[in-house]
Amino acid sequence: MEDLDPPREQPGARQLILEQLSAHGLKSDLPVTYQSERIANYHSALDALRQQSLVYPCDCPRKRLPRHYPGFCRSRSESDPTLETYALRYRIQRDQITHADAHLGQRSWKMGKSLGDFIVRRRDQLIAYQLAVVYDDIEQGVTEVVRGSDLIDSTPYQLELYQAFHHTPPTFWHFPVVLGSNGVKLSKQTGAQSVDVSTPADNLKRALRFLGQSSPDSKETSKILKSAVTAWQPAQVPKLMGRSL
């Protein structure tokens, strides 16, 4: 459970997510792990990056920066005495990162254009998303990451971290996200409605059709999921970043 940002976390959100998944027959095979309970692990990971001189302090105001960090603070030493009051950025080691996504094919990101040094510890001392998810996946032995295409641009940053931790990266597989009538991804930030847990079977069938899959004539979530696994055809999933329902 990604709960590393207390200022933005809504009360009851963690339990609601688990209840929504459970209503659709989706339950974890193992006890749920919460990132908020793994802070010490992430600081160990951060120390490993420090030992390799792969991070540096940065106090650049986020609102004034272009989308991809241009490296204003790159020459700062990790031993700078102001280190604990600034954010920490990871120093990317490659001018270009190329990766073959298992579904969308080869993608490339170039330093300065679609790539820049990224935050691994925020100014408020909170651990950043990229570092936490990579370290989680390494410690949990994750070999395949299947996620929405809105996260595909996180891939080069995560590949850099896997390299820094001397670990083979997982296979990445990105599927299209659901877009609203305005062409924007449905999300809580855009005011999208929450999942209706009173119609789980219909929701699952709709999701399968969205992904180009067949859906069985059943009202039981267990049967729908079992059929979906058996009949899964990854080649039928649209090779798109997003599409409307």
Give the ranges of each region predicted by the language model.
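N-terminal Rossmann-like or analogous alpha/beta NTP/dinucleotide-binding catalytic cores
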Residues: 1-70, 150, 154-167, 222-223
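Short alpha-helical "patches" and their helix-cap loops
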Residues: 1-10, 174-176, 217-227, 244
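Short alpha-helical interface elements
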Residues: 14, 24, 42-46, 156-159, ...
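Active-site cores that bind ATP or allylic diphosphates and position pyrophosphate for catalysis
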Residues: 57-197, 215, 245
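Non-catalytic terminal extensions that flank enzyme cores
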Residues: 93-95, 184-245
